Amino acid sequence: MLLLASASPARRRLLEQAAIPHRVRVSGVDESTIHDQDPRALVQKLAFAKASAVQSCLDPSVDGGITAVLGCDSVFVFEGEVFGKPADAKEAIDRWQRMAGGSGELLTGHCLVADGLGATMACVSTVVQFAALRLGEIEAYVASGEPLNCAGGFALEGRGGLLIRGLNGCYSNVIGLSLPWLRTALEDHCAG
């Protein structure tokens, strides 16, 4: 069984929809203490920290049946700037005014940690193309509250999906977990 080291409801839903048996345990990692200039390296470091923190606390009497721990972290890169979750509505509106009509890259770091097999890590990238939007559309979306809880300030699987013109890459990666990557990593884990 997989243990998801994440508080993300979207990641949990992806695993449920894919019928992957799992449990959830939040890592408690202070993300503000982990830095890297390269956003690809940053998301992988964060994913590793989350998976490792949870894996190091496994108790066989409670966690029997856990064969691997999965950590993930996502950031959005627009015009060379890394966007995590917006701090507030004003920041979300400002970002959306910049992003409207443009495109950026959603990066998700993945780390699967398994006893005896070490860690399997990757950064999966998806290009997100945004529709041209009027200020009123942006304000209405931000007022919904949805963009305040997502890397980059948008949720593809929610209202934000209406504001996206297209994707180049993995759909589920934009939601926070690349299911194709996970399938391959789990297959490799089982073969190991």
Swiss-Prot record:
Name assigned to this protein: Nucleoside triphosphate pyrophosphatase
First-tier enzyme category under EC: hydrolase
NCBIfam families tied to this protein: maf
GO cellular component, as recorded: cytoplasm
EC number, as in UniProt: 3.6.1.9
Pfam families, alphabetized: Maf
Cofactor section: a divalent metal cation
Role played: Nucleoside triphosphate pyrophosphatase. May have a dual role in cell division arrest and in preventing the incorporation of modified nucleotides into cellular nucleic acids.
Keywords: Cytoplasm, Hydrolase, Nucleotide metabolism
Entry-linked SUPFAM superfamilies: ITPase-like
Species the sequence originates in: Synechococcus sp. (strain CC9902)
Record's subcellular location: Cytoplasm
Family indicated by similarity: Belongs to the Maf family.
Gene Ontology molecular-function annotations: nucleoside triphosphate diphosphatase activity
Keyword Hydrolase recorded: yes
Any one GO BP annotation for this protein: nucleotide metabolic process
The organism's taxonomic lineage, starting at the top: Bacteria, Bacillati, Cyanobacteriota, Cyanophyceae, Synechococcales
InterPro entries attached to this UniProt entry: ITPase-like_fam, Maf-like
Family annotation (CDD domains): Maf
Active-site feature positions: 73
Signal peptide boundaries: none
